[in-house]
Amino acid sequence: MALWGGRFSQAADQRFKQFNDSLRFDYRLAEQDIIGSVAWSKALVTVGVLNADEQQQLEQALSVLLEEVQANPHAILASDAEDIHSWVETKLIDKVGDLGKKLHTGRSRNDQVATDLKLWCKFQITELQTAVQQLQQALVMTAEANQDAVMPGYTHLQRAQPVTFAHWCLAYVEMLSRDESRLQDTLKRLDVSPLGCGALAGTAYAIDREQLAGWLGFASATRNSLDSVSDRDHVLELLSDASIGMVHLSRFAEDLIFFNSGEAAFVDLSDRVTSGSSLMPQKKNPDALELIRGKCGRVQGALTGMTMTLKGLPLAYNKDMQEDKEGLFDALDTWLDCLHMAALVLDGIQVKRPRCKEAAEQGYANATELADYLVAKGVPFREAHHIVGEAVVEAIRQGKALEALALSDLQQFSSVIGDDVYPILALQSCLDKRVAKGGVSPQQVASAIAEAKARLF
């Protein structure tokens, strides 16, 4: 049943109907549409459109319909209804007869769909926050188990300074904390109810919209009806949250793909998250991580697409806004799947400590320690930087590590260098000296793990 038609003398072309209908994707809003309809039925009692008995009949029928939807949501797709709103109304009329036709009094699909989508977004934010926290927990547990796994830290994908695998894990805990914070901020702004704003000018019935908002679990009601039915900022914000979150997951995936490569060989991934080659029997490919990295692009595309959809729209509602759902649903589904998959990747990962340490001892990652040593001896840092650069060139020429150079070799670059330099150049010393908050010293990493556990578990 179409919710309109009196104005038209011809039926819609079937091709237009298929082009126009949205049930194939907005069926996902069925629960929210029913919940909103129950609240609206209560509001209609307060203005005399429904009596208490009628409202009870509607609510009972809607409750039964909600149970049916929860049991088999995909059954909705067998209908030829235009959208989820017309599907719910048709099913309601089937259950209660003409009484069901009274429910839409004073309500438009414009405020109805805006309400449904916000309710769905609120639930989805909770799901995403839970998944973010679960990944953070997996990272913290992996960090705790690998505090002694020394590995190279990189800049420009070149070995820079030694870090630990635990410190690497904790870096992503911080990124995910910002992701969770962004979701919480988004929730604060979307937590206002548009229901009761009608098509664009507000409802003609003196409904207490603040009370209605409370029944639906919103913090308050919106303040302007034109804005309320036009607003899709929450869609853009959630797509932005997802885009940033997927960038973080893509970087996480890229790091582990490199760490797992034969060239680095820092970690082994579980067989449960890898696959083989149809031709090369020796291959063990990091497909889970590559798919996380690859799916980042589709989420970025959804954000760009929605931004372009909205940028030229006049107030108030336009059919263009129907395009808000498919990209949002796909982007948030993708982000949620990738969060779960990233946690699964960490479950069973093996850090190859000897290889990590070997790599950390190569590439002159202790060069900064020699510069700091010279500064402690009174050499200005810029001069010390130049001296160490020359020493590295000599070490490369001899094919040795800095700490393997003879004292006489080092002293040709600076006479202040003494025997006490060698303990400074030791790998563990490089870590131990990073004692400021956020550093890679064992004490700071242990403290960061303890703080994260207190916050996340």
Swiss-Prot record:
UniProt keywords (A-Z) are: Amino-acid biosynthesis, Arginine biosynthesis, Cytoplasm, Lyase
| UniProt-listed Enzyme Commission number(s) | 4.3.2.1
According to its UniProt record, where is this protein located?
A: Cytoplasm
List cystine links: none
**Which residues are the signal sequence here?**
none
InterPro entries documented for this protein: Arg_succ_lyase_C (IPR029419), Argininosuccinate_lyase (IPR009049), Fumarase/histidase_N (IPR024083), Fumarate_lyase_CS (IPR020557), Fumarate_lyase_fam (IPR000362), Fumarate_lyase_N (IPR022761), L-Aspartase-like (IPR008948)
According to the record, the segments passing through the membrane are none
User: Record's superkingdom?
Assistant: Bacteria
Task: Using the UniProt record, name the top-level EC class of this enzyme in a single word.
Answer: lyase
> What are the GO MF terms of this UniProt record?
argininosuccinate lyase activity
Q: Which family does it belong to?
A: Belongs to the lyase 1 family. Argininosuccinate lyase subfamily.
Q: Which HAMAP family match?
A: Arg_succ_lyase
What's the protein called, per UniProt? Argininosuccinate lyase
Protein species of origin = Yersinia pestis
- What is the gene called? argH
